[in-house]
Design a protein with these regions (language model features):
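A flexible loop/linker signature enriched in serine peptidases of the S9 family
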Residues: 195, 199, 298-300, 317-327, ...
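C-terminal outer-membrane beta-barrel translocator/porin domains of Gram-negative envelope proteins
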Residues: 783, 793, 840, 847-926
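Outer-membrane beta-barrel translocator/channel fold
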Residues: 463-467, 471, 560, 772-819, ...
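Active-site-proximal alpha-helical
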Residues: 78, 173-193, 198-260
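Blade-terminus and WD-like Trp-Asp/Gly-His loop motifs, strongest in beta-propeller folds
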Residues: 305-313, 357-365, 402-410, 446-454, ...
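Beta/coil-rich, acidic/histidine-enriched accessory regions frequently appended to metallopeptidases
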Residues: 25-28, 35, 46, 246-346, ...
């Protein structure tokens, strides 16, 4: 340990005293930057409502309409929650999937990073983007989060420019405060949130509350705001936010609003959840002997576990900050092998929806579906030859899950098409597909069962009839299992009803009429063995059956099972459980998985959730019943008094009993048989006309700061002095504007020195709409410097005018090829400091140049001036004087930097930089 400390000390000492004469340009302020790659052309349209606009591309009309309908209901609710009315119109930008958003330029910072972030004011806070993941519940949560974000920003920072400039420079909120509040408002409390809160509380990861970052900060903040709401009431939250704006501080606002300091509240918050979860460990312990990996990495998310038909191999996916890898684990040798690695670790929203894995029934081929270059690709990996075959999978926006038929000629999948998540069957030989469902219900986890004659899947559909219009208007409050008769193509699904307000996912056929499923019946997502059965419902001319499912718990874990997989041929089951901040994978034989766990007591949240959802369901049924009766009265033409239908006139038929929830539909059908009705389609009522988006610019940011650097990188003209001129203290002002999608950006800047002798002006215009990014930069710089000629000092003022055309071609998000064409004019003026220089002629030089760069940059920001990762560039430049002289200059250089995080706010930075020049006007390096 002592030797290691000495080694680190010597390395630090070496770097401290290392000569830095290899600096060029502005030294450390080299231009790097990440990219957005456009693979598709999007044409944007929008709906305009009173309080919001919704922009969508040519493939997203259905999503935009769903967004509009939900937003019209949600804005008034959130305005009541925050006790604040929106002053600024919300601009929604709807993407069909996250991969489409990654092609956009929204949020992209081009050029060099801001090294001096003081005085930077962001203006636009009302523009939000949302994307569809295949689950409308998550989509609605995104919409709610977007509205809440805009409302909170307006309360804190105001909506006028003067308020933004004043408040944004003074209010700096921790991540747990802002993002935690947005998460609480948008997601409420659910089984997945509680699972992570419980894990963080019991494993003491949230002990240092104010030091949390990333997901831990969001989840801890979410639970903190729930504690505030449960203890003091939700009505205090708007007061806390308002006091935050007044006091410009996130600590004192709690003291003024609640009478307790944030420190005291954090203790009370921790005690509150420790008391709730004190009995949480009274469950089966997680299996220790069946772990696939003894200690998985904390930063990695493990998912898509899949067991091969022979039981020898287990495939799974790891995802770390957006970079995913597919692994093959040999259960006989306990060795793992990486098949592919895709994408990079970047500071962006991670898409966990792909890749999706499935084994071919032969056991010799592992297949997986990914999203690449804006499209969907299906890969076949042959274990024997290690060959990788790829096919494009067209006509779908996203594939969420899939599985093969017994003979491997078909696979059934859950896919997104036109904003709807439905079930499809794909024929591999012909490349065609058959659509099974087509509605707004969310259909997940399809599997072939019963010798591939039927398909079981999980869905929140209200009606069990395919094509029923009610599934487009109403969804169930939980997910049930449904069976589709694929052999006969029956449009009536078989619903495997269990508990009314419990959800069941990921069904796998154990044997005939028995399944492994995941369910949240107890408040913790455990595995159940579900048996499908039927009983006689009633008899008329034929026997009618009612189908149901009975289940018993096979696990009683203290944490949720995130996902599981069962292979009937192998007789093995795999599962992933999140515990102690890690994702643990397990592999069990069937006989162990079938052991009954005993009776599971529901958690406190399960009881509260069931009560709340039952009340909501009852109110919704009453509301819809009233609407249905009113609709009959409004839309029915009564032909005679005798046609009037009285509900009480009908007797109960014991052979055809009508349940309460079906009564109103039954009566409606009776009325329709006896009356002429006018069906009024009100779906489009009140929908504004579609408008075409025209490019318009919005003010984006303002910079007002004291600075010590130049606006633009540029070689300085040599004036005979031995000093590289630095501008010293100066006043910097920059303003940026861009269009709605950040495709076009205009930036203007001015730097003024105190003596007005060394000033600088810059204007930049960028076009990022296509894959080839284009930029025009005009830069004017003047500086005063001294020189020496034959022992006599003189003073010169140099004026440089530079026009650059920059073309940037991105290979992916981190690699790019940059070419720059430059025209430059230097004018050197000798100041009349004495008689010798009074009549000395000015020197004019005009240059034409070209610069080529290869740039790699995968750094992530851990904070202000705290990068983590690697960035480097290779560059070459060639300049030629074009105004009569024959001076030329050629430059080659490299700049390599690697940043390593060694503590929360401490990094180890390594840099290697080198440059050389050739020609008649060589560079002078200082």
């Amino acid at each position: 340990m002592i030797k290691l400390s000495r080694l680190i000390f010597l390395i630090v000492l070496f770097y401290v005293f290392l000569d830095s004469s290899g600096q060029f340009y502005n030294g450390h302020k080299m231009r790097f930057g990440k990219n957005r790659v456009q693979y598709s052309d999007f044409y944007w349209e929008f709906y305009r409502y009173d309080k919001f606009d919704i922009y969508f591309n040519q493939f997203g009309k259905e999503l935009a309409q769903y967004t509009a309908d939900f937003t019209r209901r949600e804005i008034p609710r959130l305005e009541r929650f925050f006790n604040y009315n929106l002053d600024k119109r919300i601009i929604f930008i709807v993407f069909n999937k996250l991969s489409d958003f990654r092609q956009s330029n929204i949020g992209l910072i081009t050029g060099q990073d801001e090294y001096n972030i003081g005085g930077v004011t962001t203006i636009s806070r009302n523009k939000v983007f949302i994307y569809f993941e295949g689950d409308y519940i998550k989509f609605e949560q995104q919409i709610t989060a977007a509205i809440a974000r805009v409302l909170i920003n307006e309360i804190l920072y105001g909506f006028e420019l003067k308020d933004n400039v004043t408040n944004s420079t003074l209010i700096n909120l921790p991540e747990w405060y802002f993002e935690g509040l947005v998460s609480y408002v948008s997601k409420g409390w659910n089984f997945k949130i509680e699972n992570k809160v419980k894990d963080g509380i019991l494993n003491k990861r949230y002990k240092k509350f104010n030091r949390l970052i990333g997901e831990d900060a969001v989840i801890a903040g979410h639970s903190f705001w729930k504690y505030i709401a449960d203890t003091y009431g939700e009505s205090v939250i708007p007061s806390i936010i308002y006091l935050t704006r007044i006091n410009k501080n996130s600590n004192s606002c709690f003291l003024y609003a609640l009478g307790f300091s944030l420190k005291q509240l954090s203790y009370d918050w921790m005690s509150y959840y420790l008391d709730l979860y004190k009995d949480a460990q009274h469950h089966q312990s997680l299996p220790e002997a069946d772990r696939i990996l003894k200690r998985p990495r904390r930063k990695r998310v493990y998912q898509q576990i899949s067991i091969s038909p022979d039981g020898k191999h287990i495939s799974y996916v790891t995802n770390e900050s957006g970079q995913y890898k597919i692994w093959l684990y040999n259960s006989e040798t306990n060795k793992k092998k990486k098949i592919i690695k895709r994408e990079h670790k970047l500071e962006q929203i991670t898409d966990y929806s792909y890749p999706v894995l499935a084994w071919h029934p032969s056991g010799r081929i592992l297949t997986f579906i990914t999203e690449e270059e804006g499209g969907i690709r299906l890969y076949y990996y042959t274990l024997a030859t290690k060959d990788l075959e790829v096919r494009n999978f067209q006509y779908f926006e996203k594939i969420l899950d899939y599985s093969f038929s017994d003979d491997g000629s078909l696979f059934v999948f859950s896919g997104i098409k036109k904003g709807k998540t439905d079930i499809f069957v794909h024929t591999i030989a012909s490349g065609t597909y058959q659509q099974i469902t087509d509605d707004y219900a969310d259909d997940f986890n399809p599997e072939f069962i019963n010798n591939s004659e039927e398909i079981v899947f999980s869905s929140n559909r209200y009606s069990d009839t395919i094509g029923s219009e009610i599934n487009n208007r109403r969804k169930a409050l939980s997910h049930d299992l449904f069976i589709y008769d694929y052999k006969n193509g029956d449009n009536v699904l078989t619903r495997l009803s269990q508990d009314r307000y419990s959800s069941y996912y990921q069904p796998y056929e154990l044997d005939k009429n028995r399944f492994f499923v995941l369910g949240d019946k107890s408040g913790i997502i455990n595995r159940y063995v579900s048996r499908f059965d039927s009983t006689i419902s009633y008899v008329d001319t034929v026997v009618h059956y009612r189908y149901y499912a009975k289940s018993y718990p096979a696990t009683d874990y203290p944490r949720n099972i995130i996902e599981h997989d069962y292979n009937q041929k192998a007789g093995k089951l795999g599962e992933i459980v999140f515990n102690d901040g890690r994702y643990y994978m397990y592999n069990q034989p069937t006989d162990e998985a079938l052991i009954r766990a005993g009776k599971i007591e529901p958690t406190w949240f399960r009881k509260a959730f069931t009560k709340k959802i039952a009340e909501r369901d009852s109110i919704e049924n009453i509301r819809r019943k009233d609407l249905s009766i009113q609709s009959i009265q409004d839309n029915t033409i009564i032909t005679s008094d005798l046609d009037t239908f009285v509900f009480g006139d009908y007797q109960i038929d014991i052979n055809n009993y009508i349940f309460e929830k079906e009564k109103i539909n039954y009566y409606n059908s009776k009325l329709k048989d006896r009356n002429i009705t006018l069906s009024l389609d009100t779906a489009e009522k009140g929908r504004p006309k579609i408008r075409i988006y025209q490019t318009a610019f919005y003010q984006n940011y303002i910079v007002n700061q004291v600075d010590f650097s130049f606006l633009n990188e540029s070689y300085q003209a040599f004036t005979g002095g031995a000093v590289y001129f630095n501008p010293g203290m100066n006043l910097l002002f920059k303003i940026g504007t861009n269009d709605l999608f950040d495709d076009y950006k205009v930036t203007g800047g001015i730097r003024l020195s105190p003596d007005f002798n060394s000033n600088e002006y810059l204007i930049s215009v960028e076009n990022l709409k296509k894959r080839l990014d284009k930029q025009i930069v005009f830069h004017r710089q003047s500086f005063k410097n001294t020189g020496e000629d034959e022992g006599e000092e003189f003073t010169v003022k140099t004026h440089t005018h530079e026009l650059s055309f920059i073309f940037r071609y991105p290979f992916d998000q981190v690699r790019s090829w940059v070419r720059t064409l430059t025209f430059r004019s230097d004018r050197t003026v000798f100041l009349a400091t004495d008689i010798n220089y009074l009549g000395k002629a000015n020197i004019y030089k005009t240059w034409a140049g070209i610069k080529v760069e290869y740039i790699f940059d995968n750094t992530r920001s851990l904070g202000i001036n705290l990068p983590n990762g690697t960035r480097y560039k290779f560059f070459g430049e060639l300049y030629q004087q074009v105004n009569g002289g024959f001076d030329d200059l050629a430059v080659l250089g490299v700049d390599f930097r690697h940043y390593i995080k060694i503590h929360r706010n401490l990094i180890w930075a390594n840099r290697f930089a080198a440059s050389t020049s050739q020609g008649s006007s060589k560079l002078v390096y200082y």
